[in-house]
């Protein structure tokens, strides 16, 4: 399926500030390409510090009125955004596929619908949110209010551009904040098109979208004195810098960072379910998922039964044109990511690891202009191996044999990360005991990589701070105010 890019994407995009697309302070632009073909899709404005300052000041001004907008009005606007996203689902999904390289079947069924659902969800959350009143005694009352923080500064990664943006924008504006958000410079196009929906629905200045380099305008957002709350999804290395900026300015930060999650397959697992779950864990979105189940821990009793099934399953995955609805895996998002994956394959070949499936870039049948890689399965001798400790961020699965549940738990916890994990077992008690023992923010049982609204998502250890995608995430974007009332009209007698 070939599409006319200009039916979906503009030739150039400005910065979205105060409800309008505007020129930046510099004439510099960044080329945005289709990673599956190398084709130029658009050019975006390269924001500078002056543009960040402009956007933050606009957001500060908009906050004065937006923070006073009633919950019912805000909720209706969030629902309108969600409705319009769904009405334009096919168009926005195609933009995401063209810009990111992921299959159209994923962007149509997951990325855009789930983004829309987050706006609907947080509309309901604020409508049902209630403060509390505590009658301390007959003359004293304590009222607890939840108030917006102010201007949110956010930067999101390139692997789920629209969905990750929705994770931050929806709760932030639902709580009454305004936001300055920057998508990755390589995958900004879906959010820039969705800005047209914000333009229709929201007051000016509530959502402002900058484009540029993370090391430039992204860093300027996080270090701006006018930003009251930071939110970031990306690598742990950059997460440290964001945390440092938050500490320097004494503002709160929500960080969703890297992972090296363990997917544990017990000897009583339903193997049909496990094979599907393993593929969901490592091949979904080409393995470019922070929660990817990239360490497979298989009970020794079923190892020789499961591994050949995985080899066959991996070899049958259709990797190809992301616009083809039959494609199961598309292109990696860029050359840097492909090179990183290849470096780990080279490390495997130079070590005592054994490549059981895949391990090659795909260039035949018209794939030579993109960044396509085979689903790859690699057996490593133990969890100390480089491939079992470091985040690869691609369709590369390391498999380790374990003798019992405790060894699986110990290996799962032997990581600097703690974002997610999985357990496959037909014994729910056994699975729950492992889930409770593994130190991660999310554990799936008998499935993997499901990320609906209404279930908290976030990590332990170096995988981040805070939780998103559930009603408690609203508190990330709120201040708690206590109003303490004494109705006795009596002196205390201390002075």
From Swiss-Prot:
It is an enzyme of class 1 (oxidoreductase). It catalyses: an aldehyde + NAD(+) + H2O = a carboxylate + NADH + 2 H(+). Disulfide bonds: none annotated. Pfam families: Aldedh. PROSITE patterns: ALDEHYDE_DEHYDR_CYS, ALDEHYDE_DEHYDR_GLU. InterPro entries: Ald_DH/histidinol_DH (IPR016161), Ald_DH_C (IPR016163), Ald_DH_CS_CYS (IPR016160), Ald_DH_CS_GLU (IPR029510), Ald_DH_N (IPR016162), Aldehyde_DH_dom (IPR015590). The active site is at residues 256, 290. NAD(+) binds at residues 212-218. Keywords: NAD, Oxidoreductase. One of its GO terms (molecular function) is aldehyde dehydrogenase (NAD+) activity. Its EC number is 1.2.1.3. Belongs to the aldehyde dehydrogenase family. This is Putative aldehyde dehydrogenase AldA.
